Amino acid sequence: MADDLVEGLTRAGLPGAKASARYVRVSPTKARRVVDLVRGRSVSEALDILRFAPQAASDDVYKVVASAAANAENNHSLDPATLWVGEVYVDEGPTLKRIRPRAQGRAYRIRKRTSHITVVVESREPVSAAGRGAKTTRRAR
């Protein structure tokens, strides 16, 4: 998906940066619950949400979002105040298979799932406070 990130431009054509964490020992479904909280938000707001989210996966997602923001700032000289979480997704990594002994010689298989977390931040102009809640007048029909 985000492999199209060439020379600091996202797929939308905006300047940005990418970071990913691979083989993270958290279930992809649990990580996706956390990722959905921050998609489309500003980086500062996303980091605040992740800092106080009760899910265990929020720590791993926090590190990746912070790393993507640092990549944008250091590698592409982008202003941290204009960064937004543009694209964020979780792919399934390899599954570690373990055995749990059960009664009468049986064994149950335990699947320890891993995830690949990818975050793409992009630089957008901040929305002004007046533009966000401004009312537009409609003509009478």
Curated annotation (Swiss-Prot):
Q: Which Gene Ontology terms describe the biological processes this protein takes part in?
A: translation
Say which family it is in: Belongs to the universal ribosomal protein uL22 family.
SUPFAM superfamilies, sorted: Ribosomal protein L22
Q: What is this protein called?
A: Large ribosomal subunit protein uL22
Traced from the root, the source organism's taxonomic lineage reads:
Bacteria, Bacillati, Actinomycetota, Actinomycetes, Frankiales
Q: Which Gene3D superfamilies match?
A: Ribosomal protein L22/L17
Spell out the InterPro entries in the cross-references: Ribosomal_uL22, Ribosomal_uL22_bac/chlpt-type, Ribosomal_uL22_bac/org-type, Ribosomal_uL22_CS, Ribosomal_uL22_sf
Spell out the subunit comment.
Answer: Part of the 50S ribosomal subunit.
**Which top-level group of life is the source organism from?**
Bacteria
Function of the molecule? This protein binds specifically to 23S rRNA; its binding is stimulated by other ribosomal proteins, e.g. L4, L17, and L20. It is important during the early stages of 50S assembly. It makes multiple contacts with different domains of the 23S rRNA in the assembled 50S subunit and ribosome. The globular domain of the protein is located near the polypeptide exit tunnel on the outside of the subunit, while an extended beta-hairpin is found that lines the wall of the exit tunnel in the center of the 70S ribosome.
PROSITE patterns per UniProt: RIBOSOMAL_L22 (PS00464)
* One GO cellular component term noted in the UniProt record for this chain: cytosolic large ribosomal subunit
Q: Which organism is it from?
A: Frankia alni (strain DSM 45986 / CECT 9034 / ACN14a)
GO MF terms here are: rRNA binding; structural constituent of ribosome
Q: Any keyword RNA-binding?
A: yes
The signal peptide here is: none
Q: What is a single Pfam family found in this protein's UniProt entry? A: Ribosomal_L22
> Which keywords does this Swiss-Prot/TrEMBL entry list?
Ribonucleoprotein, Ribosomal protein, RNA-binding, rRNA-binding
